[in-house]
Swiss-Prot record:
Name of the protein in question: Heat-inducible transcription repressor HrcA
Species this chain originates from: Synechococcus elongatus (strain ATCC 33912 / PCC 7942 / FACHB-805)
InterPro entries: GAF-like_dom_sf, HrcA, HrcA_C, WH-like_DNA-bd_sf, WH_DNA-bd_sf, WHTH_transcript_rep_HrcA_IDD
Repressor among keywords: yes
UniProt-listed HAMAP family: HrcA
Amino acid sequence: MLVSRLTARQQTILSATVRHYVRTAEPVGSKALAEQYGLSVSAATIRNAMGVLERAGLLYQPHTSAGRVPSEGGYRLYVDQLMEPDRALQRQTEQQLSQQLPDRRQSLEALLRGAAQILASLSGYLSLITFPLGLEFQVRHLQLVAIAPHQVLLIVVNDSYETQSALLTLPELDRDLEADQLDRQLLLLSNFLNQELQGRSLQALANLDWPVLGSELQSLAGILQQGLQDLEKRWQPTPATSLLVCGLADLLRQPEFNELQQVQALLELLEGEQTQLLPLMLADPAADQVRVRIGSELPLAPIRSCSLVSAFYCREQQPVGSVSLIGPTRMLYENAVAAVEATASYLSEAIAS
């Protein structure tokens, strides 16, 4: 239904009904709306408008004697056409992410876990963040260190400050190198590789101009190239088959989860192999904005009484992972959308820097 088919008064009353139910989890009547939301019209006028909204499928009465609550259609129209994200909470989310994960000098898992914890804490809902899909790490720093007369340690640090190393054995013809000569050659090789590989993946090895090093370094270069290729095979990108989940306790405090059977179904979904949740979170990677799916729009029975708010975080403008919140359909959508948007934006910047 288009919001243009509603009068301004009906839009205001629908918005007030949604806000009331989100806040209280209780149906609301016309008298309460008139008294609590300053609508400047009589309870009778509000009652008539609520009747119109009910006939339009936007509100319903859970019990004959009760007030009204929003339907899924009412939430959908509210989210799509009446709601504005809470920009103050968006700024607060950005600030907490920047302050609590200040220099980003941590592993990728620590970065994502910290972001998931902050998102859950600020929203009060269940946060879920996937690991990046097919993300190739980039070289941040490379160093060669002589640790014995015949052995060199190759150390590579990636853009998530994770470290891998390989022990290289010098060929027979180099065993008589004096320590200072070997150190000089290792420094030249380290400088060459940092210049050529910094900010690039190890796959860029195939395009390196090794002959430019000169004949003096070619024997070392061959050993080094093999060591780097071995590291590349060992250091594969993290697949997006891992899901970080935070905030379950907060979600289960919501009155919608007071039935043991429903809680058990949700726990089984979260504790399983995640093969059901991941496709849902990673669907439609072309989307460049926050997506809200409500109730029956979700195909999984354990969360069919919930809403899923999700957005992609990107690298080089390509979606690589998902940031999501799961909460009851009676969700504070203004907050959820703002917090998810801020977190996805932060992660995009973090993995790009």
